[in-house]
Amino acid sequence: MLTIGVLGLQGAVREHIRSIEACGAAGKVIKWPEELKEIDGLILPGGESTTMRRLIDTYQFMKPLQEFAASGKPVFGTCAGLIILAKNIAGTNDAHLGVLDVTVERNSFGRQVDSFEADLTVKGLEGPFTGVFIRAPHILEAGADVEVLSEHNGRIVAAKQGNLLGCSFHPELTDDHRMTKLFVEMVEKHKREAVV
């Protein structure tokens, strides 16, 4: 059985575990860097990116997370997790993991009072997907190797590059598990190809 980890430092960790399990994989909360060896794929959940970065540094996760992504194992960043994955963050020179070739803008849809839901067309999913946006970032620019999966009002809100997946919204906060399933399928494919 596939095991997908959720970085358990902050954010909607339980909700991601529930969604992973609904897709038929095992979910594991990752609290320590050495636990990354036990998983086939990793979700970086939403939360607050500055706080998450501080916790990543405190618990010495930065290098192990970069090595995990460099190994080719799939990583999915949602909301703040997208910011953590991004190569560039608008208005600052301080990227985090810097592995997904995008430039993101934080809180680009407004403050928490401006949180909203929107029906999205997501490449690879049949029918609309309800995106829950909470102080969400969006992708300002995507590199040549980045596939745009979804836009909302002309703003990129989901993208994929190799085994990296990122979205501005919180797919774990709905009962529609198709975004998580998309990631589970990426992990399955990677694990299959790694064995060959």
Swiss-Prot record:
Protein keywords: Glutamine amidotransferase, Hydrolase, Lyase, Pyridoxal phosphate
Active-site residues from the entry: C79 (nucleophile), H170 (charge relay system), E172 (charge relay system)
Q: Which GO terms describe its molecular function?
A: glutaminase activity; pyridoxal 5'-phosphate synthase (glutamine hydrolysing) activity
Q: Spell out the GO cellular component terms annotated for this protein, sorted alphabetically and separated by semicolons.
A: cytosol; glutaminase complex
Q: Which reaction does it catalyse?
A: aldehydo-D-ribose 5-phosphate + D-glyceraldehyde 3-phosphate + L-glutamine = pyridoxal 5'-phosphate + L-glutamate + phosphate + 3 H2O + H(+); L-glutamine + H2O = L-glutamate + NH4(+)
- One biological process GO term for this chain? pyridoxine metabolic process
This protein's pathway reads: Cofactor biosynthesis; pyridoxal 5'-phosphate biosynthesis
Q: Which InterPro entries match?
A: Class_I_gatase-like, PdxT/SNO, PdxT/SNO_CS
Q: Which domain of life is it from?
A: Bacteria
Enzyme Commission number(s) from the entry:
4.3.3.6, 3.5.1.2
List ligand-binding residues for L-glutamine: G47, E48, S49, R106, I134, R135
According to the record's subunit comment, the protein's assembly and interactions are:
In the presence of PdxS, forms a dodecamer of heterodimers. Only shows activity in the heterodimer.
Q: Which PANTHER family match?
A: PYRIDOXAL 5'-PHOSPHATE SYNTHASE SUBUNIT SNO, PYRIDOXAL 5'-PHOSPHATE SYNTHASE SUBUNIT SNO1-RELATED
Which family does the record claim for this protein?
Belongs to the glutaminase PdxT/SNO family.
Role, per record: Catalyzes the hydrolysis of glutamine to glutamate and ammonia as part of the biosynthesis of pyridoxal 5'-phosphate. The resulting ammonia molecule is channeled to the active site of PdxS.
Q: Which HAMAP family match?
A: PdxT
Supply the name of the protein: Pyridoxal 5'-phosphate synthase subunit PdxT
Record organism: Bacillus licheniformis (strain ATCC 14580 / DSM 13 / JCM 2505 / CCUG 7422 / NBRC 12200 / NCIMB 9375 / NCTC 10341 / NRRL NRS-1264 / Gibson 46)
- What gene, per UniProt, encodes this protein? pdxT
